[in-house]
């Protein structure tokens, strides 16, 4: 992974950038072929990797898979404003949405993506593109009642204090202590965290994982803070925050050394999206009534079951 990221980072503007892009495209294709060859070289008795199983239709989706192999790391785009390279940070959610366990660089994933594209009136190419992402993003946002309220020009009122409950010390992340959450949401969170630890050894081995570092935030205190910091309407904090509802939680899913647990740096978000905690949430949080905010791997909102 570091080798691929290093190549992506080497891209520059101008004629040299064009050459680097061509070079990266070639290398990405070679890496994909090498991975397949290595898997087959393990012998007939070796377990079949998921990506190899997803190569069940040889030839049909190979070109789309090759294009996805390149764009996964090299796509230059601005889906949320700041420039980003590649779409790896969003891959787990995309895999979940299109109903494919296949590696994003496999023909099987391309086939599933094409089926999704056709269902929503897009060109069924099997290639990830920005038009497809906009449809995906719309679906994810529509599942967040808070977002739909904001679209209507509403700012949801905070819950009565009697509906809030205190987190225990073991549920709070040390970097940012929080205190309150709506009672029914806290119960759902506890069930979810317990299930994650029971099902995933890596999560059970690290007591910090899935601890909460932001929950209910009093609207008046939040407004004063955003005014003081001059960051009221950016991606990181809004004047009308979903945390005012008592249904939003920021969960620790891991972080890069030297960066905050809620860093929006592209490298940070890409790292978080590949952690066992985040991948488990993508597949299972819905069982407990939680939906994600795609831009922030740590942010989840309870919408009921």
Q: Where do the PLM segments sit?
A:
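Acidic helix/loop microenvironments that form the catalytic cleft of cell-wall polysaccharide enzymes
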Residues: 105-120, 220, 294-305
